[in-house]
Amino acid sequence: MIIRLAILVWMMATSLFGDGLADLKNTLEKLNNRQPIRAQVKALTSSVTTEDKKATQASGSMEVTVDHNSSGVRILWSQDDLDRVRDEAVKGLKNPNLPNPLRGLMNSFNATTMDSLLAHSDDLLRTLSVSQLLSETPEARNGQTLRKLKFKVNKPLTEANRKSMKSYVDELTLWIDENGLPVASEEKTELKGSRFFIGFETSSVIKRSFRRVGDRLIVSDFESSSSNAVSVMGTNSSTSRFIVTVN
Protein backbone atom coordinates (compact mmCIF):
# COMPACT_ATOMS: atom_id res chain seq x y z
CA MET A 1 0.00 0.00 0.00
CA ILE A 2 2.78 2.43 0.96
CA ILE A 3 4.71 1.59 -2.22
CA ARG A 4 1.61 2.16 -4.37
CA LEU A 5 0.98 5.50 -2.65
CA ALA A 6 4.58 6.59 -3.24
CA ILE A 7 4.32 5.66 -6.93
CA LEU A 8 1.02 7.53 -7.22
CA VAL A 9 2.49 10.66 -5.63
CA TRP A 10 5.49 10.48 -7.97
CA MET A 11 3.24 10.06 -11.03
CA MET A 12 1.08 13.00 -9.98
CA ALA A 13 4.13 15.20 -9.46
CA THR A 14 5.60 14.17 -12.79
CA SER A 15 2.31 14.85 -14.55
CA LEU A 16 2.04 18.24 -12.86
CA PHE A 17 5.53 19.33 -13.82
CA GLY A 18 5.76 17.75 -17.28
CA ASP A 19 9.00 16.87 -19.03
CA GLY A 20 11.79 18.25 -16.85
CA LEU A 21 14.58 17.95 -19.41
CA ALA A 22 12.52 19.65 -22.12
CA ASP A 23 11.51 22.44 -19.72
CA LEU A 24 15.15 22.89 -18.69
CA LYS A 25 16.42 23.16 -22.27
CA ASN A 26 13.61 25.51 -23.31
CA THR A 27 14.37 27.83 -20.40
CA LEU A 28 18.13 27.83 -21.01
CA GLU A 29 17.69 28.54 -24.73
CA LYS A 30 15.69 31.68 -23.91
CA LEU A 31 18.54 33.12 -21.82
CA ASN A 32 20.77 34.87 -24.37
CA ASN A 33 23.18 36.58 -21.91
CA ARG A 34 23.15 39.95 -23.66
CA GLN A 35 22.13 42.42 -20.96
CA PRO A 36 25.18 44.22 -19.47
CA ILE A 37 26.05 43.19 -15.95
CA ARG A 38 28.54 44.27 -13.29
CA ALA A 39 29.30 41.87 -10.44
CA GLN A 40 31.55 41.55 -7.44
CA VAL A 41 33.27 38.17 -7.51
CA LYS A 42 35.03 36.89 -4.42
CA ALA A 43 37.31 33.86 -4.57
CA LEU A 44 38.52 31.76 -1.65
CA THR A 45 40.91 28.85 -1.79
CA SER A 46 42.63 26.41 0.55
CA SER A 47 44.82 23.41 -0.13
CA VAL A 48 46.82 20.72 1.65
CA THR A 49 49.72 19.00 -0.11
CA THR A 50 51.37 15.97 1.48
CA GLU A 51 54.79 14.86 0.29
CA ASP A 52 57.11 12.52 2.18
CA LYS A 53 54.58 12.61 5.06
CA LYS A 54 55.01 16.39 5.33
CA ALA A 55 51.87 18.49 4.88
CA THR A 56 51.92 22.01 3.45
CA GLN A 57 48.84 24.20 3.81
CA ALA A 58 47.92 27.32 1.87
CA SER A 59 44.89 29.60 1.76
CA GLY A 60 43.88 32.99 0.45
CA SER A 61 41.05 35.22 -0.72
CA MET A 62 40.61 37.97 -3.29
CA GLU A 63 37.74 40.03 -4.70
CA VAL A 64 37.39 41.70 -8.09
CA THR A 65 34.83 43.66 -10.07
CA VAL A 66 33.74 42.04 -13.34
CA ASP A 67 31.96 43.77 -16.23
CA HIS A 68 30.29 41.49 -18.78
CA ASN A 69 28.70 43.24 -21.77
CA SER A 70 28.71 43.45 -25.57
CA SER A 71 32.38 44.49 -25.48
CA GLY A 72 33.38 41.30 -23.68
CA VAL A 73 34.65 40.63 -20.17
CA ARG A 74 36.63 43.16 -18.13
CA ILE A 75 38.16 42.24 -14.77
CA LEU A 76 39.21 45.00 -12.37
CA TRP A 77 41.70 44.28 -9.58
CA SER A 78 42.33 46.61 -6.67
CA GLN A 79 45.79 48.10 -6.21
CA ASP A 80 45.95 46.52 -2.74
CA ASP A 81 45.55 43.03 -4.22
CA LEU A 82 48.17 43.73 -6.88
CA ASP A 83 50.56 44.77 -4.11
CA ARG A 84 49.77 41.59 -2.14
CA VAL A 85 50.61 39.41 -5.15
CA ARG A 86 53.88 41.28 -5.69
CA ASP A 87 54.84 40.88 -2.03
CA GLU A 88 54.12 37.16 -2.26
CA ALA A 89 56.38 36.89 -5.32
CA VAL A 90 59.22 38.68 -3.50
CA LYS A 91 58.94 36.33 -0.52
CA GLY A 92 58.94 33.37 -2.91
CA LEU A 93 62.33 34.43 -4.28
CA LYS A 94 63.75 34.27 -0.76
CA ASN A 95 62.08 30.96 0.09
CA PRO A 96 60.94 28.81 -2.87
CA ASN A 97 59.12 26.44 -0.50
CA LEU A 98 56.58 29.08 0.47
CA PRO A 99 53.11 28.52 -1.05
CA ASN A 100 51.79 31.20 -3.39
CA PRO A 101 47.98 31.05 -3.14
CA LEU A 102 47.45 34.69 -4.17
CA ARG A 103 49.06 34.24 -7.57
CA GLY A 104 46.93 31.15 -8.10
CA LEU A 105 43.83 33.12 -7.10
CA MET A 106 44.67 35.91 -9.52
CA ASN A 107 45.10 33.37 -12.32
CA SER A 108 41.66 31.92 -11.49
CA PHE A 109 40.04 35.23 -12.44
CA ASN A 110 40.29 34.53 -16.14
CA ALA A 111 37.80 35.45 -18.86
CA THR A 112 36.64 31.86 -19.39
CA THR A 113 35.78 31.33 -15.73
CA MET A 114 34.09 34.72 -15.34
CA ASP A 115 32.04 34.09 -18.49
CA SER A 116 30.91 30.75 -17.07
CA LEU A 117 29.87 32.38 -13.80
CA LEU A 118 27.97 35.29 -15.36
CA ALA A 119 26.53 33.57 -18.46
CA HIS A 120 26.15 29.94 -17.45
CA SER A 121 23.23 28.89 -19.66
CA ASP A 122 25.50 28.23 -22.66
CA ASP A 123 27.87 26.11 -20.55
CA LEU A 124 25.00 24.08 -19.17
CA LEU A 125 23.48 23.47 -22.60
CA ARG A 126 26.83 22.18 -23.86
CA THR A 127 27.05 19.79 -20.92
CA LEU A 128 23.51 18.55 -21.51
CA SER A 129 24.34 17.86 -25.17
CA VAL A 130 26.76 15.11 -24.05
CA SER A 131 24.68 13.85 -21.11
CA GLN A 132 22.18 11.04 -20.64
CA LEU A 133 19.18 11.58 -18.37
CA LEU A 134 19.02 8.80 -15.76
CA SER A 135 16.07 9.84 -13.62
CA GLU A 136 13.67 12.63 -12.71
CA THR A 137 12.05 12.84 -9.28
CA PRO A 138 10.34 15.55 -7.20
CA GLU A 139 12.26 16.74 -4.17
CA ALA A 140 11.68 19.35 -1.47
CA ARG A 141 14.73 21.59 -1.07
CA ASN A 142 14.91 24.60 1.25
CA GLY A 143 11.14 24.68 1.49
CA GLN A 144 10.64 24.61 -2.28
CA THR A 145 9.27 21.74 -4.36
CA LEU A 146 11.76 21.12 -7.16
CA ARG A 147 12.48 18.55 -9.84
CA LYS A 148 15.69 16.58 -9.40
CA LEU A 149 17.30 15.46 -12.65
CA LYS A 150 20.23 13.02 -12.60
CA PHE A 151 22.53 12.67 -15.60
CA LYS A 152 25.47 10.60 -16.71
CA VAL A 153 27.90 12.99 -18.41
CA ASN A 154 29.79 11.55 -21.38
CA LYS A 155 32.46 14.14 -22.08
CA PRO A 156 34.76 13.16 -24.97
CA LEU A 157 38.16 11.77 -23.99
CA THR A 158 41.36 11.50 -25.97
CA GLU A 159 42.62 8.06 -26.99
CA ALA A 160 45.62 8.46 -24.66
CA ASN A 161 43.36 9.23 -21.69
CA ARG A 162 41.10 6.26 -22.44
CA LYS A 163 44.09 3.90 -22.52
CA SER A 164 45.40 5.12 -19.17
CA MET A 165 42.06 4.97 -17.32
CA LYS A 166 40.77 2.00 -15.37
CA SER A 167 37.51 3.65 -14.36
CA TYR A 168 35.82 7.00 -14.92
CA VAL A 169 32.52 8.34 -13.56
CA ASP A 170 30.97 11.76 -14.18
CA GLU A 171 27.49 12.34 -12.73
CA LEU A 172 25.50 15.57 -12.69
CA THR A 173 22.46 16.31 -10.53
CA LEU A 174 20.32 19.35 -11.32
CA TRP A 175 17.47 20.83 -9.32
CA ILE A 176 15.03 22.91 -11.38
CA ASP A 177 11.87 24.81 -10.49
CA GLU A 178 8.39 24.52 -12.03
CA ASN A 179 9.48 26.67 -14.99
CA GLY A 180 12.59 24.63 -15.73
CA LEU A 181 14.97 27.24 -14.28
CA PRO A 182 18.03 25.70 -12.59
CA VAL A 183 18.24 26.35 -8.85
CA ALA A 184 21.30 24.27 -7.93
CA SER A 185 23.56 21.54 -9.26
CA GLU A 186 26.14 19.04 -8.06
CA GLU A 187 28.65 17.28 -10.30
CA LYS A 188 30.78 14.38 -9.08
CA THR A 189 33.71 12.90 -10.97
CA GLU A 190 35.96 9.98 -10.04
CA LEU A 191 38.89 8.73 -12.07
CA LYS A 192 41.35 5.90 -11.50
CA GLY A 193 44.16 4.89 -13.81
CA SER A 194 47.85 4.40 -14.40
CA ARG A 195 50.47 5.65 -16.80
CA PHE A 196 54.00 4.35 -17.16
CA PHE A 197 53.25 1.95 -14.26
CA ILE A 198 52.39 4.87 -11.95
CA GLY A 199 48.92 4.70 -10.45
CA PHE A 200 46.76 7.76 -9.85
CA GLU A 201 43.34 8.61 -8.47
CA THR A 202 41.40 11.84 -8.62
CA SER A 203 37.95 12.88 -7.48
CA SER A 204 36.04 16.14 -7.40
CA VAL A 205 32.69 17.57 -6.34
CA ILE A 206 31.42 20.84 -7.80
CA LYS A 207 28.36 22.51 -6.28
CA ARG A 208 26.61 25.48 -7.86
CA SER A 209 23.74 27.72 -6.82
CA PHE A 210 22.01 29.65 -9.59
CA ARG A 211 20.16 32.93 -9.89
CA ARG A 212 18.42 34.56 -12.84
CA VAL A 213 19.42 38.17 -13.48
CA GLY A 214 17.63 39.64 -16.50
CA ASP A 215 18.39 37.39 -19.47
CA ARG A 216 21.28 35.68 -17.67
CA LEU A 217 21.70 32.56 -15.58
CA ILE A 218 24.48 33.42 -13.15
CA VAL A 219 26.26 31.14 -10.71
CA SER A 220 25.79 32.93 -7.40
CA ASP A 221 27.85 30.38 -5.47
CA PHE A 222 30.42 27.96 -6.88
CA GLU A 223 32.23 25.51 -4.60
CA SER A 224 34.73 22.91 -5.78
CA SER A 225 36.57 20.30 -3.72
CA SER A 226 39.07 17.89 -5.22
CA SER A 227 41.66 15.34 -4.18
CA ASN A 228 44.49 13.76 -6.14
CA ALA A 229 46.79 10.89 -5.27
CA VAL A 230 49.80 9.69 -7.26
CA SER A 231 51.48 6.52 -6.01
CA VAL A 232 55.05 7.89 -5.99
CA MET A 233 54.40 11.59 -5.38
CA GLY A 234 51.92 11.96 -2.51
CA THR A 235 48.49 13.53 -2.21
CA ASN A 236 46.87 16.88 -2.73
CA SER A 237 43.46 18.15 -1.70
CA SER A 238 42.00 21.57 -2.36
CA THR A 239 38.81 23.58 -2.12
CA SER A 240 37.90 26.71 -4.01
CA ARG A 241 34.86 28.92 -3.97
CA PHE A 242 33.49 31.83 -5.97
CA ILE A 243 30.76 34.03 -4.51
CA VAL A 244 29.03 36.31 -7.02
CA THR A 245 27.11 39.41 -5.93
CA VAL A 246 25.09 41.55 -8.34
CA ASN A 247 23.68 44.83 -7.07
Task: Please report, for each region that a protein language model flagged, where it lies by residue.
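Gly/Pro-enriched, hydrophobic low-complexity segments
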Residues: R147-N247
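Hydrophobic h-region of N-terminal signal peptides that target proteins for export
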Residues: W10-G18
